[in-house]
Amino acid sequence: MPPPREPRRCRSSPRHRRTTTLKPPKVAAAHAALADVGLAPRALFVHAAYVLNTASAEEEKARRAASGLAKEYERTTALGAFGCCFHPGSAGESAPEDAAVRVGRAIAQALEAVPETAGGTRVLIENTAGAGKTMGRTPEEIAIMLAQVPAALRHRTGYGLDTCHLFAAGHPIHESAARLREVLDAFERTIGEPPAFFHLNDSQHPFGSNKDRHALLGEGQLGAEPFRWLLEDPRTRGIPCILETPSERTEVADDDATADPADARMVALLRGFLGT
């Protein structure tokens, strides 16, 4: 059997920019697929392309990234999804404070380009593993980026937390349930609101490595217990917890609804923690 690889959780390849507009038939097909498994469009989160570096100090690169984020947000809104999450990118040689201004400007540009809809699709910053000078590794960095968004648009923004990224960035969520709660408390206190989603991933690399390499829950450096602790925290009730763990099936047709074996194991593990 080939080794598991990470599944596609984006609308298409996350490593390339996308410029096409979603046509109504595609939106209808997506809604029908969600309905088949008992989900409303608001249960959907879209991950923007990884290549969008909205924090870049290079003017042209930052401009293209902002334009790309706006297009991603337009398509996410067309789907009626809850939010479009993205990695802010790297500050490069510039100061983090200056990079935060550029990220905030890109978020505002996306929100201003698309009228607010009923329910309000949001632009959501995802925390990062902290490689190089990437923005978003700490609650303070996320808070300063969101603070750059005009007050009139701020309610259409937010953030989410990836467990692999937290661990890789040096947040000790693996030590105990109490330490995990302290980390979540710090993000909520500093940013002023709870996360809009969690990405549930174990880590292939050790604590504080700054490497973003996902592993199956309980089979990486984090271990299984932190996920039990997380699900026992009241903050996860009603907040989407999304698996981004490696899959075993490397090629899956768009119309194939068969569960990936690795995904099925992960869901069973999480349900066991919940006693369901």
Regions found by a protein language model. Name each.
Residues 135-143, 167-238, 246, 254-261:
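Gly/Pro-rich active-site loop or hairpin
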Residues 13-15, 49-51, 89-91, 126-130, ...:
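Active-site beta-loop-alpha junctions enriched in small/polar residues
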Residues 1-46, 52-71, 276:
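N-terminal pre-domain/capping segments
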Residues 24-46, 103-118, 145-150, 221-233:
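Alpha-helix-loop-beta-strand connector modules within alpha/beta enzyme cores
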Residues 54-158:
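Active-site acidic/histidine proton-transfer and metal-coordination neighborhood
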Residues 18-29, 56-68, 94-105, 133-144, ...:
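Alpha-helix N-cap and loop-to-helix initiation/capping positions
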Residues 8-10, 42-48, 84-86, 123-125, ...:
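Hydrophobic faces of well-ordered beta-strands that scaffold small-molecule active sites
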Residues 252-276:
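C-terminal helical cap(s) of enzyme catalytic domains, especially alpha/beta-barrels
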